[in-house]
Amino acid sequence: MTTVKTSPTTLPLHPLIHQLAEVIISHWQDYLDLSPYELPDGLGYVEGKLEGEKLVIENRCYQSPQFRKMHLELAKVGQGLDILHCVMFPNPDYALPMFGCDIVAGKGGVSAAIADLSPANPELTLSNSYNQALSQLETPNFSDQRELPEWGDIFSEYCLFIRPHTPEEEKLFLKRVGDFLKVHCQQANQSQPGSTQQREFNIQGQEYYCRKQQQNDKTRRVLEKAFGEAWANKYMTQVLFDIPNH
């Protein structure tokens, strides 16, 4: 079992990003049997320039029997933009949803915070066990709910997409993500591998999710400006949203 260091990064990031990274890593370590996941060469730590400012990307990747890849990305652009991005990709032998979480923070505070357990099957539906567990969670109220992107049909009814305006709302967001992770890890530990046909359905669901996420023009534009089109495409398709083998 892999032991993960307490602080996922040495980058000076927004406090909410540090706190969320620690929540994510601690849940992984507490509930799952982690082992290292090797990223393509040269993509674990990346430095570049974006409009004259230094861009640093740090990636942490693990795997477990139920998850083929658990990816935590932390990025900083100059002194004005901090980013957290996390996705847990299920082992396609298991019929599990996709946990995803992102935070974007600037000098004015957190501009976007999103978390979801997104269906990864052709029907785009969560299982009864997930619906039952998630429906029992306390639903927090936030003052600034944001609209999902046009390609956002991959998200579940439990998706949280907000702009937190107070420390209290930031704490509520942290708790919600922790609740999602606890449910997800507990459900994963109780799950059993499915049939060959179910595996194909699971792969189709992950592929649909990844293709939709690859349409995120904002992420692609930032990467292209800093590293060029070819590198950006490689990073989008091999690190951020890689598709499992059939």
From Swiss-Prot:
Under which EC number(s) is this enzyme classified? 1.3.7.5
GO terms for MF:
cobalt ion binding; phycocyanobilin:ferredoxin oxidoreductase activity
InterPro entries, from UniProt?
Ferredoxin-dep_bilin_Rdtase, Ferredoxin_bilin_OxRdtase
GO BP of this protein: phytochromobilin biosynthetic process
Pfam families, per database record: Fe_bilin_red
The entry's keywords: Oxidoreductase
Tell me what reaction this enzyme catalyses: (2R,3Z)-phycocyanobilin + 4 oxidized [2Fe-2S]-[ferredoxin] = biliverdin IXalpha + 4 reduced [2Fe-2S]-[ferredoxin] + 4 H(+)
Q: What class of enzyme is it?
A: oxidoreductase
| Domain of life where this protein originates | Bacteria
Would you identify the family this protein belongs to, as annotated? Belongs to the HY2 family.
Describe the function of this protein.
Answer: Catalyzes the four-electron reduction of biliverdin IX-alpha (2-electron reduction at both the A and D rings); the reaction proceeds via an isolatable 2-electron intermediate, 181,182-dihydrobiliverdin.
Any idea what this protein is called? Phycocyanobilin:ferredoxin oxidoreductase
Q: Name the source organism.
A: Crocosphaera subtropica (strain ATCC 51142 / BH68)
